């Protein structure tokens, strides 16, 4: 759904997720004159403490999503693991940024790498997909030392294992229960940059 911009102070903004980032968003939005409604399954998440309304429903609850859309002029998400289909449903009735299609890419490290390389044409660390034990034998030796990362639901070091050899890789993949992964060559970092575009 299209929304005329800018949004005027006094309008309500929706936030999918009620953690610390949602809390910071709600505080800054209040300073700018906006009201925030948070949809978060938890009973008293950090963002709810500083928001006008808290909808305590699962992210895929039709009732919760419809209430959020009805109460707000625009909706965003505080993290990439909100179900993309929830954002797609919201977008039928309210402006949503980022869209569900972008979040779906950000939720999967393999899709994200492919997008960054082939669409954005930005160089990335050497990598390969590991989705089965048979993929381990095909890994080039030049990829080691590396980091094995779960393709989904990993953040802040969770779902990541340092590996120095094919044997380490096999053990690490097994320890991650054989879920879809990405193996990235370990590189020396000189700088890390985080960018948010509004």
Language-model features: where?
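ATP-binding N-terminal substructure of ATP-dependent carboxylate-amine bond-forming enzymes
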Residues: 1-107, 111-114
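Active-site nucleotide/adenylate-binding loops and adjacent lid/helix of ATP-dependent enzymes
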Residues: 107-194, 198
């Amino acid at each position: 759904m299209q929304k005329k911009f800018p949004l005027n102070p006094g309008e309500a903004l929706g936030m999918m997720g009620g953690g610390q980032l949602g809390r910071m968003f709600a505080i800054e939005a209040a300073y700018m004159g906006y009201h925030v409604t948070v949809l978060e399954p938890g009973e008293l998440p950090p963002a709810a403490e500083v928001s006008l309304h808290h909808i305590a429903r699962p992210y895929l609850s039709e009732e919760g999503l419809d209430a959020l859309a009805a109460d707000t002029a625009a909706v965003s998400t505080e993290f990439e693991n909100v179900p993309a289909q929830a954002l797609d449903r919201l977008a039928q009735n309210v402006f949503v940024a980022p869209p569900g299609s972008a979040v779906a890419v950000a939720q999967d490290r393999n899709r994200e790498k492919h997008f960054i390389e082939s669409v954005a044409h930005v160089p990335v660390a050497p990598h390969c997909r590991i989705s089965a034990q048979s993929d381990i034998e095909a890994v080039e030796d030049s990829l080691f030392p590396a980091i094995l990362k779960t393709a989904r639901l990993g953040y802040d070091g969770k779902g990541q294992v340092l590996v120095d050899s094919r044997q380490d890789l096999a053990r690490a993949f097994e320890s991650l229960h054989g879920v879809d992964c990405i193996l990235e060559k370990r590189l020396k970092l000189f700088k890390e940059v985080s960018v948010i575009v509004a």
